[in-house]
C-alpha cells in the first residue's frame, strides 16, 4: 500500500513528498507550504479541462466509428472531408504566422545533428546518452557492421590490424570529404601542425598544404607545432583529430592519429514516457531522481563489464586553444530535453481533493520543471541551457485545443515556480492524426515557446489504424511504409514547420532507426531524412549517433531547408488517404505470417515491461534481428491485430494459438536472462501473457489504441503478485 501525506487539499505519496521537500525544494527559491498549496490549486483548476479534452477524444471516435459503418462500401472522399470539418476534426486554418520563440540554445536553433532518446529509469543508459555529445568514429566503425568483415577484417575478440586499417582508411576518406585539403589527401598526411593560426599538413613527400577552407580550423590542444588534438568544424558540427604516436593505434598511423572524434548527439531526450515503465509513485520518483542527478551533474552508475567494476559519470566540458591564441570551451554533454507523458494517464503519486488520482502530465510538468529550474539558478555543476530555458517534449496530443492546454499548463507552472513567461519551451510530437492534419494550428497555440516538431511513424500509424478501425481491414504492418498518408505526413511536417519560421529557430525532427545492430544499412538510408528537410533525427544508441553524424557532414541541412522553404503544398488530402484494403487477397500463409510477426513482437516487449519494468529494450524479432521496441511499436502491432480480428481476417482462436506458440519462441530467446519468467506452458498464470492478449482482444476499446491503460494495470498486478510471493 502507498503511504500518503496530506498537503492542503491533496494527498501526496510519501516517497514523492519527501523527495520534493528534501531534495528539490532546498535552494530552489520556493517556500514549501506555498509550493504544495499552489500545486493543489493548479490541479483543481486544470483537471476539469483535462477531462473535457479526453471526453472530446472519445466523442470524436464514436462519431467516426458510426460514419465509417454507415459508409462502408460507398466511401466518398469529399463527403468524408465535409464530415470531418463538421465534427471539428478538421479545424479552420489560422492565418500565416511565424514562431517568435527566443532564448533557444544553438544546439536546437542552429546546429543540425543526431538526437538520442533514452529511458530515465536506467541511470547508466541516461549517462551514456548525455555523454554521447562526442563519439569515437574509430570505435563506431570498428565495433559495428559499418565496416564489412570481408578479406580478413573480422571483428574477433582481440584487435585485428586488417580491420583497423579499414577503419583508418574510412576515417581519412571522411576527412577528405568534410574538411578537404588544398592539395593532396589526408591519406598522405604525416604531420598536422598549427602555424601562424593556420593548419599546416605535411605529406609523405615533404610537401605542405592546408585546408581548402581555412576557417574550418577552430582550435587545438597541446603545442601548435605538435598538437595532441586538432579541432575542425563542418556544417556546424565539430570534428576532433586526436594525435598520439605512443597510442597502439597512433603508433601504426603515419600521422600519429589515434582517433577521429565526432560531435554527435547534440541533443538528447531524457524520456519519462514511452521508453519507461513507471506505473506508480515509487517508479515516478526513480524517473525524477535520475533526471535531477543529470541536471545537478552528480548522477553516477556503477556496473560490471568484462569482469571489471566501472563507474559512469557525466563528461566535463572540452577545452581548446583557438588559432589566434585565445581559449575555447565546448560542452562535453548533450543538451537535454525531458519528455513528459501526454494528457491521458493518471498516477497514484498524488490524489486530488476528491481522492482521485491526478493526471500524470500535470505532475510531470511541475516536478520536471522544478528539477530543471536548478540549472537556471546556479545550483548545478554544469549548465544544461546556456540561454536560461527549460526544454520539455510533450507527446500524444490530438489537435490544437490539446496543445493550447499544454501551453496553459506551462504558463501556470512558470507562475508557480517563479519563472519568466516562456522559460519552459515545448517540443510537440506530431504523432496523432488530428495533430498532423491541424499542425499549423497546433504550432500557433505555442508559437512563443515551441522549439521542435517531430514525426513518429509508429505511434502515428497506431492512431491511423485506430481512428479508422471501422473503415475496413488495414494494410499489413510493413506495407504501411509505402502508404500515401505516410509520405504526405512526412512532407507536411517539414513544409508546415518551415512555413512557420522554424529555420534557425527550432528543430524539425524525424523518427527512430530501430535496428541498432544494422549500422551499414543505417548509413545507407538515414541520410534521406536530412535530404527531406529534417535538422535532427532519432538514433537508438551513442554508437548510432556517432555514425549518423556522418550524414550531417554529407548533407548541408541549412541549404536543404532553404530550398524546401518555398514548398507551399497542402498535403492534407494525402494524409487523409486511409490505408484500408478494400478486397484483401491475402493467402492463409500471409495472414499467419502477419500474426506470427506481430504476436512475437508484442510478447517480446510486453514480457519485459510487465515482469521486469523495462520500458525500452532491444527485442529480437521472429528472424532474431534486434529491434528497439517501446510503447509506440507495441501500439501499432496490437492495433493491426485488433483491426484484423474486428474485420474477420483472423479469428480469436487463431490469434490465441499464435500467442501461445510465440510465447515459447520468446521464452527461448530470453533463456539467458536470469531474471526472466517464462510464459509457457502456464499461460493463465503469466500476467505478461495475459497483458499481451488484452492488448489485442481489448484493442478495439482502448482509447485511441493506446497501450498504457492495460500495461499500467497489469504491471501493478504483477508487482503486487511478485511482492506477495517474496513475503
From Swiss-Prot:
Cofactor dependence: Mg(2+)
Compartment annotation: Cytoplasm
Sequence positions that bind acetyl-CoA: 117, 124-125, 275, 312, 540
Catalytic residues of the enzyme: 339 (proton acceptor), 630 (proton donor)
Keyword Transferase annotated: yes
Catalytic reaction annotation: glyoxylate + acetyl-CoA + H2O = (S)-malate + CoA + H(+)
Pathway: Carbohydrate metabolism; glyoxylate cycle; (S)-malate from isocitrate: step 2/2
InterPro entries from the UniProt entry: Malate_synth_C_sf, Malate_synth_sf, Malate_synthase_TIM, Malate_synthG, MS_C, MS_N, MS_N_TIM-barrel_dom, MSG_insertion
Gene Ontology molecular function: any one: magnesium ion binding
Residues that, per the record, bind glyoxylate: 339, 431, 456-459
Residues the record lists as binding Mg(2+): 431, 459
Gene3D superfamilies referenced in this protein's UniProt entry, alphabetically: Malate synthase, domain 3, Malate synthase, domain III
Family: Belongs to the malate synthase family. GlcB subfamily.
Alphabetized PANTHER family for the sequence: MALATE SYNTHASE G
HAMAP family noted in UniProt: Malate_synth_G
Function: Involved in the glycolate utilization. Catalyzes the condensation and subsequent hydrolysis of acetyl-coenzyme A (acetyl-CoA) and glyoxylate to form malate and CoA.
Name recorded for this polypeptide: Malate synthase G
The species this protein was found in: Geobacillus thermodenitrificans (strain NG80-2)
